[in-house]
Amino acid sequence: MLTENSAVNSGGKSKCEAGACESRVNGDATSVMDLMAVSTSATGQDEFDRNAPRICGVCGDKATGFHFNAMTCEGCKGFFRRSMKRKASFTCPFNGNCTITKDNRRHCQACRLKRCIDIGMMKEFILTDEEVQRKKDLIMKRKEEEAAREARKPRLSDEQMQIINSLVEAHHKTYDDSYSDFVRFRPPVREGPVTRSASRAASLHSLSDASSDSFNHSPESVDTKLNFSNLLMMYQDSGSPDSSEEDQQSRLSMLPHLADLVSYSIQKVIGFAKMIPGFRDLTAEDQIALLKSSAIEIIMLRSNQSFSLEDMSWSCGGPDFKYCINDVTKAGHTLELLEPLVKFQVGLKKLKLHEEEHVLLMAICLLSPDRPGVQDHVRIEALQDRLCDVLQAYIRIQHPGGRLLYAKMIQKLADLRSLNEEHSKQYRSLSFQPEHSMQLTPLVLEVFGSEVS
């Protein structure tokens, strides 16, 4: 049996005894175990308060966790393990009741070991050398398996990453989410005489709000909650002969502002397109054909960034630039466009696309080889296929369980085609009316006012 005694100084007293060997100060019990009990009492007997300071039950030093069935520091953990493995026997030269602290814990090993046992440390929890080695081998095996799984995960190639980074950068450079340029447009005009058309438009917005509330409480069915059939009935007599010119002017009071907004957005879409990898390699004729045919679809995709499910509106900065359905009706648009537009925005918002997915979808939308007026179908299709491959690879990595996400995104492109057709038809109708076409910008008239030849 190994015996290790504490050193005694020339005065006959150990450093431990000369130090703070008393366990009570001024008659108050302040042991480490008392402090631990106080720190854990708020969370119950079986739950340790993670926010409370962890204190070693042996010496009061900062604890690193439970070791051998007790909360201890690394030093006392090692001391207990060594003592048990060596089957050491220590003798206290004093009364066997030394107070163990961080500073004097090396001075009386007997009382330190006794304290370890008193707080519940058990030698049965100590692993043998063979068990330690098996544990190390198991940890190493798990690390190797994790590394192998990581190596098997699908990864984007450098080229695919470069494409995504280019598109994200292009979007950031051509989409100002502060909407600071909106103050340069002709100002929005929402007020005017309360005519039948304005009243119907207000009802449209009111019912949209009701639909929004229903959607928030029951998001499982967009089609049933966003019921526009009642709204359509309100507009049955919108073109009746007794509609006055004043009524018509009030109904289109937002046309100048929204025409400027769309014209501005078209310019930004052009800037975005020029930064899509491969777009500038196309002929000028194909670039123009693609832009004229897809511009409004890209604008609708981008506008989803400002669309709110709470009130079915587009918030573009201050209150003057918060657009509701009522505002869109005052630019000459009807329910044939607004109903599918709002449903599209809601559905797209619910997909919760990453920014990378959003910009890829815009680029795929723009590079559609079946657009009217396109000449080099093969080349454009190759560019689009490459982007589709990147999108699918990204989805596989970021959404391992989202097998249907890609299909849902492609379906949104089909929805955009229908919206595009109706939007162009309504804008062409406006362009044929001199009193309204004069409010449109030349760029808007060029893109929406005539068919692509």
Swiss-Prot record:
Pfam family, any one: Hormone_recep
Paired cysteines (S-S): none
Locus of motif 9aaTAD: 442-450
Binding positions (Zn(2+) 2): C92, C98, C108, C111
GO BP field: calcium ion homeostasis; cell differentiation; DNA-templated transcription; heart jogging; heart looping; hematopoietic stem cell proliferation; intracellular receptor signaling pathway; negative regulation of transcription by RNA polymerase II
DNA-binding region as annotated in the record: 53-128
UniProt domain comment: Composed of three domains: a modulating N-terminal domain, a DNA-binding domain and a C-terminal ligand-binding domain. The 9aaTAD motif is a transactivation domain present in a large number of yeast and animal transcription factors.
PANTHER family: NUCLEAR HORMONE RECEPTOR, VITAMIN D3 RECEPTOR
Name this polypeptide is given: Vitamin D3 receptor A
Protein source organism: Danio rerio
Native organism taxonomy: Eukaryota, Metazoa, Chordata, Craniata, Vertebrata
Gene designation: vdra
